[in-house]
């Protein structure tokens, strides 16, 4: 797609790649090392990829995690996908966010991705069982 920022990635931006996916640094990182893993085929949803391409994408996610664990000594990772407008997807080319985390980067990391709906995030507290 000519207007898609992920369809025509410039080679210098690519950190890692395989036959079906490429990894690049996020241009608006929420943490140092925030990386996007993007299928080379233009699809809006990861679920529209053939199984072989989904598998290759997730293998690349694992390689990115391994690389970041060594390079920036991440203590953990938040890995996520915004699939569809209702989920917050702003670039309609599927991609996976790999966000390195450090102990102490937020006051209380419990709940992780549950914070997308703040009223549901503190499931471990009384009254949320």
Where are these regions (language model features)?
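HIT superfamily nucleotide-processing domains
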Residues: 1-129
């Amino acid at each position: 797609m000519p207007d898609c920022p992920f369809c025509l990635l410039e080679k210098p931006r690519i950190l890692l790649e395989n036959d079906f996916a490429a990894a690049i640094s996020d241009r608006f990182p929420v943490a140092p090392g925030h990386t996007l893993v993007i299928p080379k085929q233009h699809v809006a949803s990861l679920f529209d990829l053939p199984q072989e391409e989904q598998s290759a994408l997730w293998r690349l996610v694992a390689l990115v995690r391994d690389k970041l664990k060594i390079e920036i000594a991440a203590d953990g990772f938040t890995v996520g996908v915004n699939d569809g407008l209702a989920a917050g997807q702003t670039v309609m080319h599927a991609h996976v966010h790999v966000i390195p985390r450090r102990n102490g980067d937020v006051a209380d990391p419990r709940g992780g991705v549950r914070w997308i709906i703040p009223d549901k995030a503190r499931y471990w507290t009384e009254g949320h069982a």
